[in-house]
């Protein structure tokens, strides 16, 4: 390629792949496999910028066939639905409810495979309170709360009390940083591949060590 030596600027949203890999790692760490049959439902709390990244990640995960957004600002970010309809290849892949409707949100979360909370610290405490009062029926899905201070969040504690598995924002932070390193060093020489989760499992011993060292450094920085 005669243009190969010409410098170029590329922009990447590493939040997207970071979210996907954080979910994937949680499954692997528990000895589980993610089902690729588009039978899963994802619930996203909020409809701001990070929620957009979360929806993009959901669209790339073959396990997800339906996405529910609990909108804090109904009527804003109207691009979410068209993206879901374009990239999730099922009938009616998107639904939106209001963030303040605790009953509707808990009903969706109870049946969800993945729940993503991208809203600011303490903004989801009312959801945690509603969850704490939701009786004994289990919530079996995986929650990713992007907040990493405090750890765990009130929402994570309530989720775990109902039998669900919850991971904090440090997992997303770690994997988006790992993707950045892979891009900047040329290990991934183009956009993060669509099969990045599988490729992450197939990395070399050196790459495994990189992930371990980055995880250790992150934990030390957050302590």
List each language-model region with its residue ranges.
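Conserved S-adenosyl-L-methionine
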Residues: 60-66, 162-165
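Adenosine-phosphate binding glycine-rich loop
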Residues: 27-33, 140-142, 146-223
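Short, well-ordered alpha-helices that flank and scaffold nucleotide-derived cofactor binding pockets
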Residues: 21, 25, 56-60, 82, ...
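Conserved hydrophobic helix-helix packing surfaces used for dimerization/oligomerization
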Residues: 41-42, 67, 143
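Phosphate/diphosphate ligand-binding glycine-rich loop within oxidoreductases
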Residues: 1-29, 150, 158
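Glycine-rich adenosine-cofactor-binding loop
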Residues: 13-16, 23, 27, 31-59, ...
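NAD(P)-binding Rossmann-fold cofactor-contacting core
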Residues: 63-91
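Rossmann-like adenosine-cofactor binding region
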Residues: 91-167
């Amino acid at each position: 390629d005669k243009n190969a030596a010409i410098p170029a600027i590329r922009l990447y949203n590493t939040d997207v792949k970071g979210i996907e890999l954080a979910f994937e790692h949680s499954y692997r760490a528990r000895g589980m496999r993610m089902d690729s049959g588009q039978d899963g439902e994802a619930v996203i709390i909020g409809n701001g910028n990070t929620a957009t990244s979360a929806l993009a990640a959901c669209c790339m995960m073959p396990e997800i066939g339906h996405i529910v957004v609990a909108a804090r600002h109904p009527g804003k970010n109207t691009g979410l639905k068209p993206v879901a309809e374009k990239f999730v290849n099922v009938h009616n892949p998107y639904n939106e409810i209001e963030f303040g409707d605790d009953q509707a949100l808990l009903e969706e979360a109870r049946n969800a495979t993945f729940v993503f909370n991208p809203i600011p610290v303490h903004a989801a405490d009312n959801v945690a309170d509603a969850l704490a009062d939701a009786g004994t029926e289990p919530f079996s899905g995986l929650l990713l709360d992007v907040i990493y201070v405090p750890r765990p969040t009130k929402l994570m504690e309530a989720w775990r009390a109902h039998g669900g598995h919850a991971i904090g924002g440090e997992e997303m932070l770690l994997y988006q940083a790992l993707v950045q390193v892979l891009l900047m060093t040329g290990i991934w020489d183009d956009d993060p591949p669509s099969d990045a989760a599988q490729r992450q499992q197939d990395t070399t011993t050196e790459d495994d060590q990189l992930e371990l060292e980055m995880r250790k450094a992150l934990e030390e920085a957050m302590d």
